[in-house]
Regions:
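Beta-propeller folds
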Residues: 1-153
Length: 153
């Protein structure tokens, strides 16, 4: 496990990780899980969990998830950046989505989405205020949102 985040006083969110020779520390595999401090009530937040036989699939998240923030005024909620994997050969569109996730229940609400790979910066209320993407020449493009729900400038 790596990337440990406290979502509230009694619950942590962790990323499944892998350790390889000659690497200084484990690296995230893009799957997120939560647990209370007693290691009970564990939840899969983001991962690809296929079904088998009669069992339905638990989660079918085809992509890479990272915790990018904690929502200060809503204990137990984290902000997760999810970059979807391409759907087919030649598909270079990597959709970026940001979710507000309840670490206890696993419920999620999409709060941002862009059809290109992007990173976001958030204010104290968990609202995306800065968005960084790249143009056709791989130059960074920084966009600003003056207030909640307003257009990107």
């Amino acid at each position: 496990m790596t990337d440990i985040h406290w979502s509230d006083d009694a619950r942590v969110v962790v990323a499944r990780a892998k350790m390889e020779p000659l690497r200084a520390r484990p690296y995230s595999l893009g799957e997120l899980f939560s647990s209370d401090i007693n290691v009970k009530n564990q939840r899969t937040l983001f991962a690809y969990v296929p079904g088998s036989g009669e069992q339905a699939a638990g989660r079918k998240d085809r992509g890479f998830a990272t915790v990018v923030g904690i929502v200060d005024h809503e204990p137990g909620k984290v902000l997760v950046d999810f970059i979807a994997w391409p759907e087919s050969i030649g598909d270079e569109t990597l959709t970026s989505s940001v979710y507000k996730v309840d670490a206890g229940s696993g419920n999620r609400q999409e709060i941002e989405q862009t059809k290109q790979t992007a990173s976001f910066s958030f204010d104290g209320r968990g609202r995306a205020r800065l968005r960084t993407t790249t143009d056709g020449n791989d130059n960074p493009v920084l966009m600003y949102r003056p207030g909640a729900g307003e257009q990107w400038l």
